[in-house]
């Protein structure tokens, strides 16, 4: 009987310890997630800059200094530092990097150890060259009418070819017929007039001899009577 009450209270103590360990593990996991969220938000606040872009600062320095041969890196650096005081600690390195980048892109011109802005005359020239390129495709539609007008020439050529072919065919067809049929006819026709000419020649001299004898008698008889009277 004495053994039963000793074994009963041991079971609830083990369950309480397990529950305490579970709550501690849950409490430790919560702050780790919060730290990750805070670390992601911090870089956004650092990205804002209080000064304009490097191209604006450099172009402003070159235009205000107005040097004939261009402004050196030292002069640009000094001008920007005097005007903009909230600059990063590595401003000089960044300035050199951006100067090289702008020269490579064509926004700046490097002359020996100085930098200049591109000439104002060279900038509008490409703009003027681009404007005429836009209307050219529209004008290109006009030659289409010329091409359409050129089509009748091709038709005329085809018609000329067809006429030439028809003429050649027409010439070939009659050339074959007269060779067989007309070869014998001209001979017979030519032979008949020869006979007629001979008969006419034979008959004509007999008539000519009889006619003048009669005319002489009739003409002379009245003339002799009148003279005698």
Curated annotation (Swiss-Prot):
Protein name: Histone H1
PANTHER family registered for this protein in UniProt: HISTONE H1
Cited PROSITE patterns: H15 (PS51504)
Alphabetical UniProt keywords: Chromosome, DNA-binding, Nucleus
Matches recorded under CDD domains: H15
Localization of this protein: Nucleus; Chromosome
Biological process terms in GO annotation: chromosome condensation; negative regulation of DNA recombination; nucleosome assembly
One Gene Ontology CC term in the entry: nucleosome
Family: Belongs to the histone H1/H5 family.
Region entry Disordered, spans: 1-52, 125-229
Purpose: Histones H1 are necessary for the condensation of nucleosome chains into higher-order structures.
Organism lineage: Eukaryota, Viridiplantae, Streptophyta, Embryophyta, Tracheophyta
Pfam families (UniProt xref): Linker_histone (PF00538)
Superkingdom field: Eukaryota
Basic residues bias (residue ranges): 32-45, 139-160, 206-229
């Amino acid at each position: 009987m004495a053994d039963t009450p000793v074994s009963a209270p041991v079971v609830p103590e083990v369950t309480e310890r397990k529950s305490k360990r579970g709550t501690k593990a849950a409490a430790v996991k919560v702050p780790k997630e919060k730290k990750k969220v805070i670390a992601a938000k911090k870089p956004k606040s650092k990205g804002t800059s209080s000064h304009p872009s490097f191209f604006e600062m450099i172009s402003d320095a070159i235009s205000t200094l107005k040097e004939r041969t261009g402004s050196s890196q030292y002069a640009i650096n000094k001008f920007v530092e005097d005007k903009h005081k909230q600059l990063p600690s590595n401003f000089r390195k960044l300035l050199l990097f951006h100067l090289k980048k702008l020269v490579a892109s064509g926004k700046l011109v490097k002359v020996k150890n100085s930098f200049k802005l591109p000439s104002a005359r060279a900038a509008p020239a490409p703009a003027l060259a681009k404007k005429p390129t836009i209307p050219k495709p529209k004008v290109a539609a006009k030659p289409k009418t010329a091409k359409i007008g050129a089509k009748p020439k091709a038709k005329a050529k085809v018609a000329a070819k067809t006429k030439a072919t028809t003429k050649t065919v027409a010439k070939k067809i009659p050339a074959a017929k007269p060779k067989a049929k007309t070869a014998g006819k001209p001979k017979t026709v030519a032979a008949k007039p020869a006979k007629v000419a001979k008969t006419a020649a034979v008959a004509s001299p007999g008539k000519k001899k009889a006619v003048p004898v009669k005319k002489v008698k009739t003409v002379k008889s009245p003339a002799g009577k009148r003279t005698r009277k």
